[in-house]
Amino acid sequence: MKQILFAGVIGLFLTLVGTPLLIKLLARKGYGQYIRDDGPREHASKRGTPTMGGIAFILATVAAYFLAKGITSYLDPDIDAGPTFSGLLVLGLMVGMGLVGFLDDYIKIVKRRSLGLRARAKMIGQLTVGIAFAVLSLQFADNRGNTPASTKLSFITDFGWTIGPVLFVVWALFMILAMSNGVNLTDGLDGLATGASVLVFGAYTFIGVWQFQESCANALTLTNPGACYEVRDPLDLAVVASALMGSCLGFLWWNTSPAKIFMGDTGSLALGGVLAGLAICSRTELLMAILGGLFVLITMSVVIQVGSFRLTGKRVFRMAPLQHHFELKGWSEVLVVVRFWIIQGICVIVGLGLFYAGWATDK
């Protein structure tokens, strides 16, 4: 359990200290945000703000993960605190999606092209990373036969519907692409996506700890053995989630309004990808839609807006994604962000409540 605390604290410290150094570096190179002309007028003042800030919390998360394990092993050599395949796989997904986002950001900055990577190239990059994760997640079973992912669909735990490896890859790709682009759409206001991510990664830290304590490997000592969890490396998933929570919290210090740096696609694609990876490996795939409810809500606002305009020629919202609709209604940016954080907090509370209820009622 110590490594979970170490990971969160180290991640927090690294982004608090490291982000301003990244801000200076990006500003010196002129890597500032390109603002679209069709957005809210208030956003024009953000033009030139350093972007690609996701580099800070991606590096901090990876460093916090390994440092936490090294410190834990040093303090207590009897504890097996080495990296696990599940933890490395989820971190690899984060880094891979972050690289796709980095290329997108780089093209926006260097080419001064607001849309960044061509849609086809961006999709190919995301698919490549997602397929690699999905295929590898069904390999390398532990001594109980558990692989990082399962071909059964899951809500709070796996349920009986097995979809097979091919459909699983398709399902995993859908989750990764949907959530990575959902976080990307959410990242339109200072601190919005970062703060929401802190909350959801906090939830996955709790889930990982709970699944470790209630693991089927310890069935003889459990108070409710009928509700145990067959999850590979749940404690290590909690370490990853804690490192992410701490790193995002430290980054939020610099990303909150008025933002000194933006995460860019580098950060948003990485956060969405790693969130989907945590859900897949913790067997909470459908629960992710509730825990990450704000990302789903904002994504659906875009789907509704585009669908309505194509079918009827009319728009449902003044502007999509949803946060900009409220800006155009006269809400201040800070008001929108705080209220959306509250919505995300409610989603996390409901999701964790369902998670606990599933354990308590499954005898």
Swiss-Prot record:
The chain crosses the membrane at residues 3-23, 48-68, 83-103, 121-141, 159-179, 192-212, 234-254, 261-281, 286-306, 340-360. It comes from Streptomyces coelicolor (strain ATCC BAA-471 / A3(2) / M145). Pathway: Cell wall biogenesis; peptidoglycan biosynthesis. Its EC number is 2.7.8.13. It holds the Pfam family MraY_sig1. This is Phospho-N-acetylmuramoyl-pentapeptide-transferase. InterPro entries: Glycosyl_transferase_4, PNAcMuramoyl-5peptid_Trfase, PNAcMuramoyl-5peptid_Trfase_CS. The keyword Zinc does not apply. The keyword Isomerase does not apply. One of its GO terms (cellular component) is plasma membrane. Belongs to the glycosyltransferase 4 family. MraY subfamily. It is found in: Cell membrane. GO terms for biological process: cell division; cell wall macromolecule biosynthetic process; cell wall organization; peptidoglycan biosynthetic process; regulation of cell shape. Catalyzes the initial step of the lipid cycle reactions in the biosynthesis of the cell wall peptidoglycan: transfers peptidoglycan precursor phospho-MurNAc-pentapeptide from UDP-MurNAc-pentapeptide onto the lipid carrier undecaprenyl phosphate, yielding undecaprenyl-pyrophosphoryl-MurNAc-pentapeptide, known as lipid I. Disulfide bonds: none annotated. The gene is mraY. Keywords: Cell cycle, Cell division, Cell membrane, Cell shape, Cell wall biogenesis/degradation, Magnesium, Membrane, Metal-binding, Peptidoglycan synthesis, Transferase, Transmembrane, Transmembrane helix. One of its GO terms (molecular function) is phosphotransferase activity, for other substituted phosphate groups. It catalyses: UDP-N-acetyl-alpha-D-muramoyl-L-alanyl-gamma-D-glutamyl-meso-2,6-diaminopimeloyl-D-alanyl-D-alanine + di-trans,octa-cis-undecaprenyl phosphate = di-trans,octa-cis-undecaprenyl diphospho-N-acetyl-alpha-D-muramoyl-L-alanyl-D-glutamyl-meso-2,6-diaminopimeloyl-D-alanyl-D-alanine + UMP.
